[in-house]
Amino acid sequence: MGSDLPTLPASPDRLLRVRKLAKRYVRGGVWGKRVPVIAVDGVDLEIAGGQTLALVGESGSGKSTVARCVARLEKPDSGQIWIGEKDVGDLSSSSRLPLRSAVQMVFQDPVTSMNPRFTAVEVVEEPLLIQGLDRERRRKVALESIDEVGLLRAWADRSVMQFSGGQRQRLAIARALMLRPKLLVLDEAITGLDLSAQAQIANLLQALQTSHSLTYLLISHDLALVTRMADAIAVMAGGRIVETGPTSQMMMAPKEQETIRLLASARAAQSRLGALTEASA
Protein backbone atom coordinates (compact mmCIF):
# COMPACT_ATOMS: atom_id res chain seq x y z
CA MET A 1 0.00 0.00 0.00
CA GLY A 2 1.74 3.11 -1.20
CA SER A 3 1.12 6.57 0.21
CA ASP A 4 2.05 8.12 -3.14
CA LEU A 5 -1.20 6.88 -4.72
CA PRO A 6 0.25 5.00 -7.70
CA THR A 7 -1.79 5.08 -10.88
CA LEU A 8 -2.97 1.58 -11.74
CA PRO A 9 -4.21 0.06 -14.99
CA ALA A 10 -7.57 1.59 -15.85
CA SER A 11 -10.63 -0.34 -14.73
CA PRO A 12 -13.55 1.90 -15.71
CA ASP A 13 -16.19 -0.69 -14.82
CA ARG A 14 -14.81 -1.40 -11.32
CA LEU A 15 -15.29 1.34 -8.74
CA LEU A 16 -13.96 -0.66 -5.78
CA ARG A 17 -11.19 -3.26 -5.92
CA VAL A 18 -9.76 -4.87 -2.79
CA ARG A 19 -6.74 -7.16 -2.99
CA LYS A 20 -5.22 -9.34 -0.22
CA LEU A 21 -6.69 -7.20 2.55
CA ALA A 22 -5.53 -8.22 6.02
CA LYS A 23 -6.29 -6.91 9.49
CA ARG A 24 -5.26 -8.29 12.87
CA TYR A 25 -6.04 -7.20 16.41
CA VAL A 26 -4.42 -7.96 19.74
CA ARG A 27 -6.81 -8.64 22.60
CA GLY A 28 -6.44 -9.52 26.26
CA GLY A 29 -6.59 -13.23 27.08
CA VAL A 30 -6.27 -15.44 30.16
CA TRP A 31 -3.95 -14.05 32.86
CA GLY A 32 -3.63 -10.81 30.92
CA LYS A 33 -1.81 -12.48 28.05
CA ARG A 34 -2.16 -10.58 24.75
CA VAL A 35 -3.74 -12.77 22.08
CA PRO A 36 -3.52 -11.97 18.33
CA VAL A 37 -6.83 -12.24 16.48
CA ILE A 38 -6.98 -12.46 12.68
CA ALA A 39 -10.08 -10.51 11.69
CA VAL A 40 -9.48 -10.33 7.92
CA ASP A 41 -7.12 -12.69 6.13
CA GLY A 42 -6.34 -11.96 2.47
CA VAL A 43 -9.71 -10.73 1.22
CA ASP A 44 -10.24 -9.97 -2.49
CA LEU A 45 -13.41 -8.32 -3.74
CA GLU A 46 -14.58 -5.82 -6.34
CA ILE A 47 -17.75 -3.93 -7.23
CA ALA A 48 -18.69 -2.50 -10.60
CA GLY A 49 -19.85 1.10 -10.63
CA GLY A 50 -23.54 1.46 -9.89
CA GLN A 51 -23.81 -2.10 -8.53
CA THR A 52 -24.39 -3.56 -5.07
CA LEU A 53 -22.23 -6.26 -3.50
CA ALA A 54 -23.59 -7.88 -0.34
CA LEU A 55 -20.95 -9.11 2.09
CA VAL A 56 -22.55 -11.73 4.32
CA GLY A 57 -21.40 -14.10 7.04
CA GLU A 58 -21.91 -14.99 10.66
CA SER A 59 -21.06 -12.61 13.48
CA GLY A 60 -17.28 -12.45 13.82
CA SER A 61 -16.63 -13.51 10.23
CA GLY A 62 -14.82 -10.24 9.49
CA LYS A 63 -17.33 -8.51 7.23
CA SER A 64 -17.67 -5.34 9.32
CA THR A 65 -13.88 -5.08 9.60
CA VAL A 66 -13.65 -5.18 5.81
CA ALA A 67 -16.29 -2.44 5.65
CA ARG A 68 -14.41 -0.24 8.11
CA CYS A 69 -11.13 -0.75 6.25
CA VAL A 70 -12.75 0.22 2.94
CA ALA A 71 -14.14 3.37 4.57
CA ARG A 72 -10.69 3.90 6.20
CA LEU A 73 -12.13 3.96 9.69
CA GLU A 74 -9.64 1.15 10.31
CA LYS A 75 -6.14 0.99 8.87
CA PRO A 76 -5.42 -2.35 7.14
CA ASP A 77 -2.23 -4.17 8.09
CA SER A 78 -1.61 -5.05 4.45
CA GLY A 79 -3.28 -5.27 1.06
CA GLN A 80 -4.63 -2.76 -1.39
CA ILE A 81 -7.90 -0.83 -1.61
CA TRP A 82 -8.48 0.88 -4.93
CA ILE A 83 -11.16 3.46 -5.59
CA GLY A 84 -11.17 3.75 -9.35
CA GLU A 85 -7.50 3.85 -10.31
CA LYS A 86 -6.09 4.99 -6.96
CA ASP A 87 -4.69 2.84 -4.17
CA VAL A 88 -6.11 4.46 -1.04
CA GLY A 89 -5.28 1.76 1.48
CA ASP A 90 -2.39 3.57 3.18
CA LEU A 91 -3.34 7.23 3.05
CA SER A 92 -2.20 9.62 5.75
CA SER A 93 -4.85 11.56 7.68
CA SER A 94 -4.31 14.69 5.58
CA SER A 95 -4.42 12.75 2.29
CA ARG A 96 -7.60 11.01 3.35
CA LEU A 97 -9.89 14.02 2.86
CA PRO A 98 -10.62 13.29 -0.83
CA LEU A 99 -11.47 9.71 0.12
CA ARG A 100 -14.04 10.96 2.62
CA SER A 101 -15.84 12.57 -0.27
CA ALA A 102 -15.68 9.41 -2.40
CA VAL A 103 -16.64 6.90 0.31
CA GLN A 104 -19.22 7.36 3.04
CA MET A 105 -20.45 4.88 5.65
CA VAL A 106 -23.95 4.42 7.07
CA PHE A 107 -24.09 2.51 10.35
CA GLN A 108 -26.67 0.27 11.99
CA ASP A 109 -27.37 2.73 14.80
CA PRO A 110 -27.24 6.30 13.46
CA VAL A 111 -27.55 7.81 16.95
CA THR A 112 -23.98 6.76 17.79
CA SER A 113 -22.67 9.00 15.01
CA MET A 114 -24.94 11.97 15.73
CA ASN A 115 -24.47 14.72 18.30
CA PRO A 116 -27.70 14.51 20.39
CA ARG A 117 -27.58 18.28 20.91
CA PHE A 118 -27.75 18.94 17.17
CA THR A 119 -30.85 19.65 15.16
CA ALA A 120 -31.63 17.56 12.10
CA VAL A 121 -30.24 20.16 9.70
CA GLU A 122 -27.07 20.57 11.77
CA VAL A 123 -26.45 16.82 11.64
CA VAL A 124 -26.95 16.68 7.88
CA GLU A 125 -24.82 19.74 7.07
CA GLU A 126 -21.93 18.69 9.33
CA PRO A 127 -19.75 17.15 6.53
CA LEU A 128 -19.79 20.48 4.68
CA LEU A 129 -17.95 22.23 7.52
CA ILE A 130 -14.65 20.80 6.24
CA GLN A 131 -15.47 22.23 2.80
CA GLY A 132 -15.53 25.78 4.16
CA LEU A 133 -19.07 26.54 2.97
CA ASP A 134 -20.82 29.42 4.68
CA ARG A 135 -23.75 28.72 6.98
CA GLU A 136 -26.41 29.84 4.50
CA ARG A 137 -25.06 27.62 1.72
CA ARG A 138 -24.65 24.64 4.09
CA ARG A 139 -28.24 24.94 5.24
CA LYS A 140 -29.57 25.21 1.69
CA VAL A 141 -27.78 22.05 0.55
CA ALA A 142 -28.73 20.19 3.75
CA LEU A 143 -32.42 21.06 3.33
CA GLU A 144 -32.31 19.77 -0.23
CA SER A 145 -30.83 16.51 1.01
CA ILE A 146 -33.48 16.25 3.75
CA ASP A 147 -36.12 16.63 1.05
CA GLU A 148 -34.50 13.92 -1.03
CA VAL A 149 -34.63 11.30 1.71
CA GLY A 150 -38.33 11.89 2.30
CA LEU A 151 -38.34 14.04 5.44
CA LEU A 152 -40.14 17.34 5.90
CA ARG A 153 -38.19 20.61 5.88
CA ALA A 154 -40.48 21.76 8.66
CA TRP A 155 -38.73 19.25 10.92
CA ALA A 156 -35.23 20.54 10.11
CA ASP A 157 -34.80 22.45 13.37
CA ARG A 158 -36.01 19.65 15.62
CA SER A 159 -33.55 17.79 17.83
CA VAL A 160 -32.39 14.52 16.25
CA MET A 161 -33.65 12.78 19.40
CA GLN A 162 -37.23 13.67 18.40
CA PHE A 163 -37.01 11.43 15.33
CA SER A 164 -37.88 7.74 15.11
CA GLY A 165 -35.27 5.12 14.29
CA GLY A 166 -36.26 5.03 10.63
CA GLN A 167 -36.26 8.82 10.40
CA ARG A 168 -32.81 9.03 11.98
CA GLN A 169 -31.55 6.53 9.44
CA ARG A 170 -32.91 8.80 6.70
CA LEU A 171 -30.97 11.67 8.27
CA ALA A 172 -27.83 9.52 8.31
CA ILE A 173 -28.29 8.78 4.60
CA ALA A 174 -28.92 12.46 3.86
CA ARG A 175 -25.68 13.34 5.65
CA ALA A 176 -23.77 10.64 3.76
CA LEU A 177 -24.89 12.17 0.46
CA MET A 178 -23.67 15.68 1.28
CA LEU A 179 -20.17 15.15 -0.16
CA ARG A 180 -21.51 13.45 -3.29
CA PRO A 181 -19.83 10.08 -2.67
CA LYS A 182 -19.31 7.37 -5.27
CA LEU A 183 -19.49 4.49 -2.77
CA LEU A 184 -21.76 3.99 0.24
CA VAL A 185 -20.74 1.34 2.76
CA LEU A 186 -23.95 0.17 4.44
CA ASP A 187 -23.03 -1.69 7.63
CA GLU A 188 -26.26 -3.36 8.79
CA ALA A 189 -27.90 -0.01 7.98
CA ILE A 190 -31.46 -1.39 8.07
CA THR A 191 -31.05 -3.89 10.92
CA GLY A 192 -33.08 -3.08 14.01
CA LEU A 193 -35.88 -1.23 12.22
CA ASP A 194 -39.40 -2.62 12.05
CA LEU A 195 -40.38 -4.37 8.82
CA SER A 196 -42.26 -1.38 7.42
CA ALA A 197 -39.33 0.98 8.03
CA GLN A 198 -36.91 -1.57 6.57
CA ALA A 199 -38.91 -1.74 3.35
CA GLN A 200 -39.12 2.06 3.13
CA ILE A 201 -35.36 2.53 3.65
CA ALA A 202 -34.58 -0.21 1.12
CA ASN A 203 -36.81 1.56 -1.42
CA LEU A 204 -35.07 4.85 -0.66
CA LEU A 205 -31.59 3.36 -1.10
CA GLN A 206 -32.53 1.81 -4.43
CA ALA A 207 -33.99 5.10 -5.68
CA LEU A 208 -30.90 7.03 -4.57
CA GLN A 209 -28.62 4.48 -6.21
CA THR A 210 -30.33 5.16 -9.53
CA SER A 211 -30.53 8.95 -9.21
CA HIS A 212 -26.94 9.38 -7.96
CA SER A 213 -25.24 6.45 -9.76
CA LEU A 214 -24.14 5.13 -6.38
CA THR A 215 -22.23 1.93 -5.69
CA TYR A 216 -23.06 0.00 -2.51
CA LEU A 217 -21.08 -2.36 -0.28
CA LEU A 218 -23.93 -3.87 1.74
CA ILE A 219 -23.08 -5.63 5.01
CA SER A 220 -26.10 -7.64 6.10
CA HIS A 221 -27.36 -10.93 7.48
CA ASP A 222 -30.90 -10.27 6.19
CA LEU A 223 -31.46 -12.73 3.36
CA ALA A 224 -34.57 -10.97 2.05
CA LEU A 225 -32.78 -7.62 1.91
CA VAL A 226 -29.72 -9.13 0.22
CA THR A 227 -31.86 -10.88 -2.39
CA ARG A 228 -33.73 -7.67 -3.10
CA MET A 229 -30.81 -5.23 -3.27
CA ALA A 230 -27.63 -7.07 -4.21
CA ASP A 231 -26.32 -7.79 -7.70
CA ALA A 232 -23.71 -10.13 -6.24
CA ILE A 233 -22.96 -11.82 -2.91
CA ALA A 234 -19.65 -12.58 -1.21
CA VAL A 235 -19.72 -14.98 1.75
CA MET A 236 -17.19 -14.57 4.56
CA ALA A 237 -16.06 -17.11 7.16
CA GLY A 238 -13.03 -16.96 9.40
CA GLY A 239 -11.82 -13.69 7.91
CA ARG A 240 -11.83 -15.01 4.35
CA ILE A 241 -14.23 -14.92 1.42
CA VAL A 242 -15.23 -18.52 0.74
CA GLU A 243 -17.56 -17.95 -2.22
CA THR A 244 -18.78 -15.13 -4.41
CA GLY A 245 -21.09 -14.84 -7.39
CA PRO A 246 -24.25 -13.27 -8.84
CA THR A 247 -27.12 -13.16 -6.36
CA SER A 248 -29.40 -15.51 -8.32
CA GLN A 249 -26.65 -18.11 -8.62
CA MET A 250 -25.67 -17.87 -4.97
CA MET A 251 -29.27 -18.20 -3.78
CA MET A 252 -30.24 -21.04 -6.10
CA ALA A 253 -27.05 -23.06 -6.45
CA PRO A 254 -24.39 -22.26 -3.84
CA LYS A 255 -21.28 -24.43 -4.13
CA GLU A 256 -19.47 -24.13 -0.79
CA GLN A 257 -20.72 -25.80 2.38
CA GLU A 258 -20.34 -22.59 4.38
CA THR A 259 -22.65 -20.79 1.94
CA ILE A 260 -25.18 -23.62 1.96
CA ARG A 261 -25.21 -23.70 5.76
CA LEU A 262 -25.46 -19.91 6.06
CA LEU A 263 -28.37 -19.67 3.63
CA ALA A 264 -30.18 -22.56 5.32
CA SER A 265 -29.75 -20.89 8.71
CA ALA A 266 -31.03 -17.56 7.35
CA ARG A 267 -34.06 -19.19 5.74
CA ALA A 268 -34.89 -21.03 8.98
CA ALA A 269 -34.67 -17.77 10.94
CA GLN A 270 -36.97 -16.05 8.47
CA SER A 271 -39.47 -18.90 8.68
CA ARG A 272 -39.52 -18.63 12.48
CA LEU A 273 -40.00 -14.87 12.25
CA GLY A 274 -42.85 -15.34 9.77
CA ALA A 275 -44.54 -17.86 12.04
CA LEU A 276 -44.23 -15.58 15.08
CA THR A 277 -45.56 -12.62 13.11
CA GLU A 278 -48.54 -14.62 11.88
CA ALA A 279 -49.27 -15.98 15.36
CA SER A 280 -49.28 -12.50 16.88
CA ALA A 281 -51.48 -10.99 14.15
Where are these regions (language model features)?
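Conserved ABC ATPase signature
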Residues: S159-F163, Q167
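Helix-to-loop junction immediately C-terminal to a conserved catalytic motif
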Residues: A71
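ABC ATPase "signature
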Residues: T244-G245
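Conserved ABC ATPase "signature" region
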Residues: D87, R137-A154, L263-A264
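ABC ATPase NBD coupling module
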Residues: V30-V35, V88-Q104, F118, E122, ...
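Conserved catalytic motifs of ABC-family nucleotide-binding domains
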Residues: R180
